[in-house]
Amino acid sequence: VHAKTLIDGVSDTPKTDQLITCEDGKIIAIEDYHETNEPVVEANVVTPGFFNCHVHIMEPVGFGTDKEFTFIEKTFYTQKHLEDYINSGVTFIRVLGTENDYDMDIRDCVDAGIVKGPHMLCAGRCICMTGGHGWQGGIEADGQDECRKAARTLLKKGVDLVKIMATGGVMTKGVEPGSAQLTQEEMAVIIEEAHKAGRKTATHAQGTQGIK
């Protein structure tokens, strides 16, 4: 690749006229541009891949909450999303909530080269209170014991991180978006279990009360 401008994420300033050599999908050399017998792709700007740290890989976008989709429809939307990420330069995504923990199956298929897509960290199902935000595809848990069990269940299935619903949200009907839902005590045991397993957590917190 002949990069007229290269932003490598390490240098203080962009570099110009760089030759990037790739082999088996990996960059093996970056040097000042020179003539070569190998095929060269011209690129105005080359940067490291972008990260998107909050996605829901199986959810079609732009349809609101009223339309329902079949599993097959969601599967093809998922494939389209994966292609769109790669084509827009996104090479890493953090998936924060997927029904039936399907995101981990998708992650494994990407890693195995079965389908093309970005690198993925997956949270599986979110943990929410009964009837709370995300209950349709999440694990409903009330009290510290149920929350601890929910976290352990997800960790057993192989999640990369655990997603917690601290407040309501706009995409769940009948729920006040800013209302506090899981208690601090409930969230604490989820975080404890995740950390014991060497995993991080991510929390949906919409509104000041949930953030606090």
Name the predicted role of every residue range.
Residues 105, 146-212:
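Histidine/acidic residue-rich metal-binding segments in metalloenzymes
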Residues 65-116, 139-163:
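Alpha-helical scaffold segments that flank or form the walls of functional sites
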Residues 1-35, 44-46:
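N-terminal metal-binding scaffold of metallo-dependent hydrolase/deaminase domains
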Residues 49-55, 93-94, 120-124, 162-164, ...:
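Hydrophobic faces of well-ordered beta-strands that scaffold small-molecule active sites
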Residues 56-60, 95-103, 128-130, 168-172, ...:
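Active-site environment of divalent metal-dependent phosphoester hydrolases
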Residues 58-73, 130-145, 172-181:
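Acidic/histidine-rich helix-loop elements
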Residues 45-49, 107-108, 112-121, 125-128, ...:
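N-terminal carbohydrate-binding accessory modules
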